[in-house]
Amino acid sequence: MKIWVVVSINCLDIISLLSLEGIGRKRVGLILKQYRNISLSIKDIYEILKDKNYYFTLKELYQVYEKSKNIIEELNQSKIHMIDCLSTAYPDSLRKIEDPPLLLFIKGYYDFIYNEKNCLAVIGSREPTKKGKKTAYNIARYLARKKFSIISGLALGCDTQAHLACLKEKGRTAAILAHGLNMIYPKENEKLAQDIIDKGGCLISEYLPYEKAKNYTFIERDRLQSALSQAVIVIETEETGGTMHTVRFAKKQNKLLACVQYTPEQMQDYKLSGNKIILNELNAIPVRNYEDLDDLITYLRENKS
């Protein structure tokens, strides 16, 4: 009589299902929702997939599960934390969004991400103007002084300045990555990534350790930057810039949206064309000076509940 390995829907199952060709995150999410409290054997999973018109042999499933066990072992060796969407440790702020990650991989110290009301996303162009680069640094540093944690994406330009400024003030910052945690993109920020970890912050990803960044993963990670934050502050962006994805997610998630408003002359620069849209069409709160920042901070603190 064949004895089937018995498993429950957990990290091992999620990694295995995500590793199967042709099965996306949303389909895996539906399976999790349907069978979350049921212990399943690999044969059960074979039948479930077959019923949903996904045809894999039992041998293929066993091989995938073995590879997934190796991935989990590698995560342990690399000191990467893994939290599945069914865990009580999964952040509530991510449960609320339309398409929550099935898994979170985190490197570093991440207790502060559970306090969404104390986290602010500071984001902007990879190729900002000199003024934009300086503004990103100054705003993030000021917010860190006021004891806010900074969420950003480790990209060159505004993101880099936001992380650096937060660290300068001995604040805590989280970088949301568009790839697995066994690599850093861009390479120029490898040292910054390590500094973030060493100084009490963290790197966060929803992708398997060796998964490379793709165009769509940069967009997907943007929804996490806004979800983990009480508000999103845009420093500088073109109307077609990647920052606009985070802006759209912020609006969809009902997050407070603020945007730097430069002088009328500076606002004519195409690099700020996104700022004009965010301010004029999306009704973002304008940030023109430190007084505006103080007003924003007061509002955020009065609306923490």
What is each model feature region?
Residues K2-K134, R141:
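Short, positively charged patches
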Residues C85-S305:
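Glycine-biased, small-residue-rich flexible motifs in mid-sequence functional cores and linkers
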